[in-house]
């Protein structure tokens, strides 16, 4: 099983995942997930199962906002458990110019270099 080091875990979350979310690159985003990954948003509450469920969630995000940005990351990563977490800011803008700003926390569980489970806690 492939194990990532601390920096690789952080890069997986911030560069391979979030940078592609911000570009709305669906294929690149989904490439970070195992086929049977589970994406949970306890603050909604909602659970998206498998790549198809995760794809549907991102189709809604990408279709609902003209601009998507995630940044100001504060990350922790544990090589032994293959986990990474981040506190970060989110900026979203709709087609009519409405702006949404959030401060979120994500927790990722990584197996063999890809996400197996993700938990997202949103501020609003």
Indicate where each model-derived feature is located.
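Short beta-strand edge/turn micro-motifs at domain boundaries
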Residues: 101-124
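Short, cysteine-centered beta-strand-loop-beta hairpins and adjacent loop/turn segments enriched
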Residues: 91-101
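A short hydrophobic beta-strand element
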Residues: 79-90
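Short beta-strand segments enriched in hydrophobic/aromatic residues
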Residues: 33, 88-92, 106, 121-122
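Short, surface-exposed coil-to-beta transition loops
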Residues: 69-70, 85-87, 100-106
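A solvent-exposed, acidic/Ser-Thr-rich amphipathic alpha-helical stretch
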Residues: 26-79
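Structural motif
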Residues: 36-38, 83, 107, 114
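Short, low-complexity N-terminal intrinsically disordered segments enriched in polar/charged residues
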Residues: 1-32
